Amino acid sequence: MGFTDETVRFNLDDGNKKEISETLTHVYRSLEEKGYNPINQIVGYVLSGDPAYVPRYNDARNQIRKYERDEIVEELVRYYLQGNGIDLK
């Protein structure tokens, strides 16, 4: 599949936003409880797609795998921009 020079749209269901946020919080806390660096582990998962970066502890692995990685990235970008005063419409 080739790349196109045209801009394409990507839309995330609004209902998923809160669920993704809650899931990331749950995964972060589970990683922290197990003694891992949560940021490094979540980044490793998002970049590679390898679920081994997230432990089964507290069902964290199954929880994060409910979402596509691009949905997670979108929520992270949205949260970052809003936290820096960008008014997202």
Swiss-Prot record:
Origin superkingdom: Bacteria
Pfam families linked to this entry: IreB
PANTHER family, per the entry: UPF0297 PROTEIN YRZL
Record-linked NCBIfam families: PRK05473.1
Membership in a protein family: Belongs to the UPF0297 family.
Protein name (record): UPF0297 protein SMU_2079c
Organism expressing this protein natively: Streptococcus mutans serotype c (strain ATCC 700610 / UA159)
